[in-house]
Amino acid sequence: MPIGVPKVPFRSPGEEDAIWVDVYNRLHRERLLFLGQEVDSEISNQLIGLMVYLSIEDDTRDLYLFINSPGGWVIPGIAIYDTMQFVPPDVHTICMGLAASMGSFILVGGEITKRLAFPHARVMIHQPASSFYEAQTGEFILEAEELLKLRETLTRVYVQRTGNPLWVVSEDMERDVFMSATEAQAHGIVDLVAVENSGDFT
């Protein structure tokens, strides 16, 4: 029997009694954000709204985005990436589980030197597929010219943020390239790999 989203106690400053809030609401108050599903317009808008709100609330404290995502739609993913670059606080990205496709694109968009992968995380990059856009009819449509422009956009970002040459990134994006956490670090997608059983990073 499903239990729904777990609730945790939270005491507002100046309040004597704690109230029960869902765990994500509580974590958001600590500036911890989660992308734990496919990237679509709904989760994209939620994360963008949270990043903007938390930036207005305090533009000096860093944000932390935990990613466990198989990817998803390109345009909503780019919207998350652009917001991460736009907001004043640094955005740490943390890969736990899988960051594939648009998940890896958002991962690489974290503040350089503040991108982390857990030891057993997996990262996958590839070129955008034609199912990035949902038409009103529910059918997926993409013009070849638009797909090429999107591929160029994603490739430029990977080149800029990984430090790899254009030919290396272009070659990698020809197919599904899966990486371990240490391989993703060597590839420049993350900067740090968490060390098990300690609070240190390598």
From Swiss-Prot:
Pfam families named among the record's database cross-references: CLP_protease
Reactions it catalyzes: Hydrolysis of proteins to small peptides in the presence of ATP and magnesium. alpha-casein is the usual test substrate. In the absence of ATP, only oligopeptides shorter than five residues are hydrolyzed (such as succinyl-Leu-Tyr-|-NHMec, and Leu-Tyr-Leu-|-Tyr-Trp, in which cleavage of the -Tyr-|-Leu- and -Tyr-|-Trp bonds also occurs)
Disulfide cross-links: none
InterPro entries per UniProt: ClpP, ClpP/crotonase-like_dom_sf, ClpP/TepA, ClpP_His_AS, ClpP_Ser_AS
Annotated function: Cleaves peptides in various proteins in a process that requires ATP hydrolysis. Has a chymotrypsin-like activity. Plays a major role in the degradation of misfolded proteins.
Designated gene of the protein: clpP
Subunit relationships: Component of the chloroplastic Clp protease core complex.
Any one GO molecular function term: serine-type endopeptidase activity
Transmembrane annotation, as ranges: none
EC numbers, comma separated: 3.4.21.92
Family as reported in the entry's similarity comment: Belongs to the peptidase S14 family.
Catalytic residues (UniProt): 101 (nucleophile), 126
One annotated GO biological process: protein quality control for misfolded or incompletely synthesized proteins
Cellular component aspect of the GO annotation: chloroplast stroma; endopeptidase Clp complex
Keyword terms: Chloroplast, Hydrolase, Plastid, Protease, Serine protease
Chief location category: plastid
Top enzyme category: hydrolase
Name of this protein: ATP-dependent Clp protease proteolytic subunit
Record's subcellular location: Plastid, Chloroplast stroma
